[in-house]
Amino acid sequence: MKVLVSAYACYPPSTEMCTEEDKKMADGEALLGWNLIGQIVRSHDVWVITQARNRRGIERALQRGGQSALKAVRFTYIDFPGWPEALWDNQISNHFYYYFWQILAFFRARTLHRIVHFDLAHHLTFANDWMPSFIGAFLPVPFIWGPIGGGHTTPKALRQEYTWSQRLGDYYRMTVQWIGRNVLISRRRCQKRAKAILVCNYETKHKVPARWQDKVRLFPVNSLSPENFGESLVNRPEDGVFTILTVGRLRQLKGFGLAIKAFAMFTRKYPSSKLEIIGDGPDERRLKRLARELKIEDRVLFSTWLPRNEVFRKMAKCDVFLFPSFREGGGAVIVEAMANAKPVIGLDTGGPAFHIQPEWGIKVAPTSYDQVLGELSSALQRLFLDGNLRHRLGEAARRRAMDYYLLDRLGERLEKIYREALLPT
């Protein structure tokens, strides 16, 4: 089968020798694009349209070897010439750029289709429900959309974590999402034409109109390889210190401020504990200041960006993984912690609400600010006092990760969706 994949975000995993640009480009969604394309090409002839910024990383990874299947993929790189680099990290300009990039991608796809005659088109990334795929809306071939997200929002109770400018940014985001869902005809055509709509969390599922709900399939935006799995046995560290780990880009919406405040409440009762934060980003200075103000700077350890294999080693040694991100569509680090047999504490919203279930973790409903802090602290206390519970949740988390998130399993599920899409209606 000849498959056309639109993957605006597609970048190989970062390595120890990677540049700062590689670290920024190889985020969760870009890894999703790279990994799932590797699964699709195992069974099909694949053409991929992606942005030109990805070219260097993709070609370097293919030259290094170890990606033999992906060498069969025909990559096409497109971008607007002369787009200023300074605008890449600007949310507003990126929304406009991505919208018009989709138009470029459609015209390139139409040209390719006249030559190749595709059997199926798949919009893989970016993963949001409110921005249309022009390939999906207008290219005359069966179409798969997703996995998409974007249905999640910042809980009102936690908006006080934002600065005033971040609150304005959040309102801007909600406004453009409303316009996308209610005004853009091309977005409605995507829903109508799609043979399957893959969604990565429950909130996004609920954004799909009732008449198209029969097309919806829950499908994660995070995946695991066999080497990501740690030992199944959960052990306390030899030094007897209860270790809480959290990982991610240091941005306010990731909830690291909540993690520090909840840990401060917990460690007053149980001082033989530490919180380790791995990551870098614009919120680092504020977070370090917060730890000093709460007089726990000696128990909060900050580690800069680390390669994935180093992060997995840290996960293997911790007791609990804490991830109170309050605007998260996916949450790759949650799945990675589960693979390392760690119980996860997170918020009942977005991707974490999908990943974490009572059988293998603890979810906190974001009802009010003080309630969130109190319940996060109580969850830490509960897991600190009950080693058997930690072990039971950790083992269940590892089984869930093996059953649901293993990349080969996701490839099998995607192949089934492809086959169903081509069945006569």
Model features per residue range: what roles?
Residues P343-G346:
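Short hydrophobic beta-strand element within catalytic cores of glycosyltransferases
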Residues V176-S232, D239:
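Donor nucleotide-sugar binding/catalytic pocket of nucleotide-sugar-dependent glycosyltransferases
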